[in-house]
Curated annotation (Swiss-Prot):
The keyword Iron-sulfur applies. PROSITE patterns: SAM_MT_RNA_M5U, TRMA_1, TRMA_2. Belongs to the class I-like SAM-binding methyltransferase superfamily. RNA M5U methyltransferase family. Keywords: 4Fe-4S, Iron, Iron-sulfur, Metal-binding, Methyltransferase, S-adenosyl-L-methionine, Transferase. The active site is at C340 (nucleophile). The lineage of its organism: Bacteria, Pseudomonadati, Pseudomonadota, Betaproteobacteria, Nitrosomonadales. The keyword Repeat does not apply. Pfam families: tRNA_U5-meth_tr. It comes from Nitrosomonas europaea (strain ATCC 19718 / CIP 103999 / KCTC 2705 / NBRC 14298). This is Uncharacterized RNA methyltransferase NE1857. [4Fe-4S] cluster binds at C72, C82, C85, C160. GO terms for biological process: rRNA base methylation.
Length: 393
């Protein structure tokens, strides 16, 4: 069953949204952009309790003025295509505008008045191609590539334009091993994965071994490090700084430059903590901790209750729970928050503000051009005597 319509906006996941002219339901459509007019086929019937469904574009009648031909020949939106860079169909200025819209929508949805938010332009990536310093491919011994969206199908990839030169060379080195019996998956598995970055050798090949987390865009990572350095300089010195989700020390290195005598850095990954400890950063005490443990703030309270500054860079889940957080960090005055998800950032920011905190700086950064991803940096300050009861969840 098909219908015609126009893409009006993008969903929080970066899919085009079109309204059915007859039933009034909204449908999410991959590979479309606001202003596209086309013919769509419903692929997922909306349930009675839902006001949306999924559809696919079967014919483009009129292109959005922002639409362009993607540079990558592997990009597509079927079950046999790579859709890792779904926004490559649009010009870059429009991509940045939509990323900002994603953030503003998330903030508005939790309760923020957008008129009170002073959000500037998104910090663009200096490079639109050749920027990515790490990648993960899947292989079954016959094919090597990325997995098609919503499937268990490996899309063979001969080249990837967003990888930096070293990673592109790694990809070619891996392809020379095909076919490989050693890369065949174990019974019951669909594939093995190979995780590489531009600082690791492509050979010998290590199957199913994950590299420690690393920001994927060096230039934008340097921008964020500079932001953190400036933020820490502006907000005075503290006798103790706590960092949560420190990884292998990307931002810990910046914190150590402040000269703070006591820096507690927490991370769940023991491998990352080992790497951080080997750096021997001055004043840094690196510790493993399950930061998503239901009683984590009670566990950490004794060690963090006198900290004046908190730096955190959580995964997409954000902090998950703030129950007991404000009690544990009783002396905290400044929070420097680096986030990779606007929805969980908005959730956490709303709870901060309802408990007497105020953000004084928010910046949006584009780490991954051609994707819906947006990075957020923000500084929060404690408004002493302005804490509202009943929001400590």
């Amino acid at each position: 069953m098909s219908f015609q319509g126009e893409i009006t906006h993008l969903s929080q996941k970066g899919l085009g949204v079109v309204q059915h002219p007859e039933n009034g339901l909204s449908y999410f459509v991959a590979g479309t952009w606001p202003g596209d007019r086309g013919e769509f086929e419903i692929t997922d019937r909306a349930l009675n309790n839902r006001k949306y469904g999924y559809a696919r574009l079967i014919r483009l009648i009129q292109s959005s003025r922002h639409r362009k031909t993607p540079e990558c020949r592997f990009l597509g939106f079927s079950g046999n295509d790579c859709s890792g860079c779904p926004w490559m169909i649009a010009d870059y200025d429009s991509q940045l505008e939509q990323k900002k819209n994603r953030f503003l929508y998330a903030m508005h949805r939790v309760g923020f008045d957008l008129a009170d938010l002073n959000i500037g332009a998104v910090q663009p990536s200096p490079d639109l191609f050749g920027y990515r310093n790490r990648f993960q491919v899947k292989t079954d011994g016959e094919k090597l590539g990325f997995v098609a969206e919503g499937s268990h199908h490996i899309v063979p990839i001969e080249d990837c334009l967003i990888l930096n030169p070293a990673c592109r060379q790694h990809l070619q080195t891996l392809r020379k091993h095909l076919p490989s019996r050693e890369w065949s998956p174990a019974p019951g598995d669909d594939w093995n994965f190979i995780d590489l970055d531009d600082q690791s050798p492509a050979e010998p090949v290590l199957l199913n071994w994950k590299q420690p987390f690393r920001q994927g865009n060096d230039a934008q990572n340097q921008w964020m490090r500079s932001w953190l350095k400036y933020a820490l300089e502006q907000h005075g010195h503290s006798h103790k700084i706590v960092e949560l989700f420190c990884g292998s020390g990307n931002f810990t290195e910046v914190i150590a430059q402040t000269g703070c005598p006591e820096i507690l850095a927490y991370e769940a990954d023991p491998q990352a903590i080992t790497v951080l400890r080997q750096k021997n950063l001055p004043g840094v005490d690196a510790r493993t901790a399950d930061l998503y443990h239901p009683f984590i703030w009670k566990i950490l309270k004794k060690n963090v209750q006198d900290a004046g500054i908190l730096v955190l860079d959580p995964p997409r889940s954000g902090l998950k729970t703030l129950r007991g957080f404000f009690d544990a960090f009783a002396a905290l005055e400044t929070i420097c928050y680096i986030s990779c998800d606007p929805v969980t950032f908005a959730r956490d920011a709303w709870i901060f503000c309802k408990n007497g905190w105020k953000f004084t700086d928010i910046q949006l950064i584009d780490l991954f051009p051609h994707t819906p991803h947006i990075e957020i940096t923000a500084t929060f300050h404690k408004q002493w005597g302005n804490t509202k009861k009943g929001n400590k969840r």
